[in-house]
Amino acid sequence: MKAEAILRGAAPTYNTTALSLVNDLRTTRKAAPMTNLTLDDMLKERARELNWETTRRTDLIRFGKYEDAWGYKTDADKNKRIFPIPAAERILNPGLQQNFGY
């Protein structure tokens, strides 16, 4: 997350760069260091590093790629970026309105 924040324009701390942070991790994992880092590279690296951590959907939304076709998924409804509000919660708080599309 820190490398992504720096890559997106946040101020680095302790003279670190996004590339150096990712390469430190890759070195620990016995992977070859990268010479360049883009947001697409960062998304791919997060997919490898956080495999099975259930962060992929959120990452795809944050990187603006959730609606893209990939693998067996052909497209996605933009309304599905957010989840529905459970009926039990809406009963407890009548002021809540269901998210659009549900």
Go through each PLM region and give its residues:
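Extended, hydrophobic/aromatic-rich amphipathic alpha-helical segments that build helical scaffolds
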Residues: 1-25, 39-53
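Long, intrinsically disordered, low-complexity segments
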Residues: 34-102
